[in-house]
Amino acid sequence: MPTNSIVTIRYGPYDSCGIVDHRTFRLDGLQAVLKGDGHRYVLEKTDDWNTVELIVNGERVYTCNITDLVFGGDGRLDPLCQEAIDAVREAY
């Protein structure tokens, strides 16, 4: 996939301390990895609980549980962020 492509990050609400809400703290690493690889991204809220989906050219290329992502990390040590960036690179 060429750099400077737009990746849509769809994320749903998740439960934290008994409160269900859309939060982006767990997406920090994913955003950093995408930006570091030269991609632009758009955050899009969805009603599906606990989900993260990466959409490239209208096609879902990666999905995972948002609570499995490392909280507030830079994405370098998070294996899910590495899987996600590999999926974006392989998208056409």
UniProtKB/Swiss-Prot annotation:
Entry-linked Pfam families: UPF0728
Disulfide links within the chain: none
Domain of life: Eukaryota
Family: Belongs to the UPF0728 family.
Protein name, entry field: UPF0728 protein C10orf53 homolog
Native source species: Danio rerio (Zebrafish)
Organismal lineage: Eukaryota, Metazoa, Chordata, Craniata, Vertebrata
